[in-house]
Each structure stands twice: as structure tokens, then as C-alpha cells.
């Protein structure tokens, strides 16, 4: 995470189990941050409904009348959110991935048979948007980064099929899983995250075991926080 530009990059490995009786030839991911861009489906919805979320609009005067204008509509390039994917592979073989708004559609290199496993790997780059709803940067409480749904998130597949719905500020429907996450960020930032901090005695900031003193070398510029979150 670059705390000056609010941009971040990473890589993801996902071991996917097909618990269904169906053979899967495609998979879908959510790219939620892409909703926070002018012209997105969420932006269009805000502009077209009568009662938009008050957090997502500005009140402006047009011809002497007060109207509600989408905050997303006016975001500048360094204020938007985005999530971009590259180098998508299935078991080491390149698969075809296509981004459509907040959804990534992947045509698999090989089908996933019922009750079998496969491994997906990918690289991603993102930018944290100005806070519009629950996530974003520089919120009113003084939190620098409120990170929710910030990574490429596999969509849910169940008896109804794929739940690859575009994000328009409605509720989430996701997959339960075991997460192992490493986040490298400026050493002056204190993180909170789901699960357990595995390297607390390297991080300090009050997370360390009682009696442990954590002293960082003066040349240290960043820290890598290692979280493990089972079944979330």
C-alpha cells in the first residue's frame, strides 16, 4: 500500500472447491471498487432514483432549485476507486479474464468437475476511493483507510447458479473461506483486521504478548502485517 497515492497492488492465490453437482466452465469475481467511478452502474443508479442514499449525493442548486447530484459523478481520477486484474491463471495455465464494470468473468483453462479443487492465481492493482459509503479514505472519524471489499472476491455459486450481480450499493452475497493475508504498509500505520495477527511480536503497537518489547530498526520504513482468518 502506498499511503501517499492511496494505491495498492498484490497477488492472490485461491484454492477453489466445487461443492456443487455441476461442472463449472466459468467463474466470476467481484471488483467492488470499480463502482466508485463516474459512469459506473452505481453512479447511474444514484442519478436515476428518487431517494438516493444521502451519503452518496451532494445538494446543489440548478435553476434556483435544490437537486441531489451523485458524488461519484464528480470524482477526479485520483479520487476514484478501481481494481484491475492481470496474469490470471488456473493451475498454472493462463485463463481468459474479462472485466465488465464490477464483475470479472473468467473462461477457465479446464472445467472444474463436481467436488474437485483447482487453484487460481492473479495479480491486482487498486486505488482506494474517497469515502462515499462505508469504505474509502479519510472518513469523518479520522480513519485514514477504511478497507472493505478491497480485493478480487470470488462470487457465490449455488443451486441458483452464479451470483455475479453488478455492485450498485446493495447487500453482499459471498463465499465462506479461510484467509491468509499479508499487508505491507508504512510502519506508522496501525491496522485492524479480521482473524488473528500471526506476527504480533514483530509488529508491536500493543498487539504483542505481555512483557515483549518490540523495537524496530531506525531504517525500517514498512511493516508487513500477517493475518489469518478461518471460516469468514
PLM features per residue range, with description:
Residues 1-9:
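N-terminal, polar/Ser/Thr-rich
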Residues 9, 22-29, 40-41, 132-134, ...:
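Short, hydrophobic/aromatic beta-strand segments
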Residues 10, 113-122:
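Short Pro-Gly-centered flexible turn/kink motifs
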Residues 16-20:
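Asparagine-centered strand-capping/turn motif at beta-strand->loop junctions
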Residues 23-56:
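Surface-exposed, glycine/proline- and aromatic-rich loop segments on solvent-exposed faces
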Residues 53, 60-90, 97, 123-232:
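Extended, low-hydrophobicity, Ser/Thr/Pro/Gly-biased non-transmembrane segments
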Residues 91-105:
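Extracellular/luminal ectodomains and secreted, surface-exposed scaffolds of diverse proteins
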Residues 102-106, 118, 223:
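Short strand-edge motifs at loop-to-beta-strand transitions and within beta-strands
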